């Protein structure tokens, strides 16, 4: 868990971190689009369930729920390659 007061990355920053671990760069746009869709859907559900949340808070929670961007990127790198 992140330390209190440490800002969570935005959806775009999270996707960029994930793609930083995927060597086959032609797939970066597709990976970013899919991750963004999942994160935006999760954010929107959080906002529906808790209207008191700000958009930024809901986005931060959605990003945090995705876990470690390095670990995710390394796993995606295994399936997104040119060979």
Show which residues each predicted segment covers:
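Short, charge-enriched, intrinsically disordered boundary segments that mark the beginning
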Residues: 1-22
């Amino acid at each position: 868990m992140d330390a209190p007061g440490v800002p969570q990355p935005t959806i775009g920053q999270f996707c960029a971190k994930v793609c930083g671990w995927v060597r086959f760069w032609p797939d970066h746009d597709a990976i970013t689009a899919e991750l963004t869709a999942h994160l935006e859907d999760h954010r929107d559900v959080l906002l529906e369930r808790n209207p008191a949340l700000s958009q930024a808070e809901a986005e931060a929670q959605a990003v945090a729920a995705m876990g470690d961007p390095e670990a995710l990127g390394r796993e995606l790198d295994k399936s997104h390659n040119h060979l």
